[in-house]
C-alpha cells in the first residue's frame, strides 16, 4: 500500500501569508486563496494547501484555535450520519428588561448579579449532539474560552475565494455551498440559547434584567435560584456583580465589578417582552401546525 502524501500544511501567521502571497504573485503562479476571519488558505494547482492563521506573535494567536478544524471534522461526521439540521431563523441572544432597569435607576436600587454560563455554546453544541463526548471534554480541558467561541462561530463564516492566474486575481466569489452546509448548526446552537434566555425570563420575571450572549443578570436575592435553574439545564456557572448607571432609551450603561470598568451597550428595541411575545406566537403556530 502506497503511503499517503501530506497535502495540508500549517504555514504560519498572516504576516507569513502576506509574504507567500507576494512571492506567488511576483513569480506569476496560479492558485486560489480562501479567506475567513483570521485564517487564509492558499491552494496550489497540485492540491497542496498552505494554511495561515492569526497575527504575528504568540500574544495575537488565539489559544485553542486548533479546535476549529476538530469541530469541523465532527460536524462533517454528523452530516454524513444524520444530514444537516433544519435551518432556523437568526435569533437574538442579547436582550434587556427595560421596565426593570428603569425601576432600578429610579431609586429602587438593589445589587444585580451576572450568572455567567461557562462555555455556553460549547455545552449547547454537545447537548445537541454536534460534537462527541471526547471533543467536548478536550475543549473544556483547554480552558480557552476564546478558542471554544471561535470553533463554534466559524460554523457561520462565509468563505471568500480569490482565484489567481499567472499572478493576477481574475475572480472573487463566495463559498455559499459551504456556508449553507455549516451555518444551520451555528444558528441551531444560537436558537437553543435563545430558548434558554426566554425560559429564564419566564422564571424570573421582574427580577430578570438582561441576558448577554451567555450571561443571565438577576437580582442578587435570586442568584441561587438562577444558579439552580442553569444547573437543572445542565450548565455550570460563575458570578459577578454589576451596577446600572444610565439608560437613555438607546444605550444602557453599567459598572462591571469583575472587570472594574464602565460598560455601555446599545439597547435599541431589544426589549425582552417583545422577544417573549414573538417566541410564544411561534410556539402556538407550531402547536397548531401539528
Model-derived features: where do they sit?
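Conserved acidic
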Residues: 1-290
Amino acid at each position: 500500500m502506497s503511503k499517503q502524501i501530506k497535502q495540508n500544511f500549517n504555514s504560519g501567521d498572516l504576516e507569513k501569508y502576506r509574504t507567500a502571497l507576494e512571492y506567488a504573485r511576483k513569480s506569476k503562479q496560479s492558485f486560489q486563496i480562501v479567506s475567513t476571519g483570521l485564517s487564509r488558505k492558499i491552494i496550489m494547482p497540485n492540491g497542496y494547501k498552505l494554511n495561515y492563521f492569526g497575527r504575528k506573535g504568540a500574544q495575537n494567536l488565539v489559544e485553542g484555535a486548533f479546535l476549529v478544524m476538530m469541530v469541523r471534522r465532527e460536524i462533517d461526521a454528523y452530516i454524513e450520519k444524520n444530514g444537516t439540521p433544519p435551518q432556523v431563523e437568526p435569533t437574538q441572544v442579547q436582550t434587556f428588561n427595560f421596565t426593570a432597569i428603569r425601576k432600578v435607576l429610579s431609586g429602587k436600587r438593589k445589587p444585580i448579579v451576572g450568572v455567567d454560563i461557562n462555555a455556553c455554546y460549547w455545552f449547547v453544541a454537545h447537548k445537541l449532539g454536534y460534537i462527541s463526548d471526547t471533543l467536548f471534554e478536550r475543549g473544556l480541558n483547554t480552558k480557552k474560552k476564546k478558542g471554544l467561541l471561535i470553533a463554534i462561530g466559524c460554523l457561520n463564516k462565509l468563505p471568500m475565494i480569490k482565484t489567481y492566474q499567472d499572478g493576477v486575481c481574475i475572480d472573487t466569489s463566495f463559498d455559499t455551498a459551504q456556508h449553507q452546509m455549516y451555518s444551520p448548526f451555528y444558528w441551531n446552537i444560537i436558537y437553543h440559547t435563545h430558548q434558554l434566555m426566554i425560559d429564564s425570563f419566564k422564571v424570573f420575571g421582574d427580577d430578570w434584567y438582561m441576558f448577554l450572549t451567555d450571561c443571565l443578570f438577576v437580582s442578587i436575592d435570586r442568584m441561587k435560584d438562577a444558579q439552580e435553574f442553569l444547573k437543572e439545564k445542565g450548565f455550570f456557572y460563575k458570578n459577578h456583580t454589576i451596577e446600572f448607571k444610565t439608560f437613555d432609551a438607546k444605550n444602557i450603561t453599567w459598572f462591571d465589578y469583575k472587570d472594574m470598568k464602565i460598560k455601555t451597550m446599545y439597547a435599541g428595541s431589544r426589549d425582552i417582552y417583545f422577544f417573549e411575545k414573538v417566541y410564544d406566537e411561534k410556539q402556538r403556530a407550531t402547536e397548531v401546525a401539528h
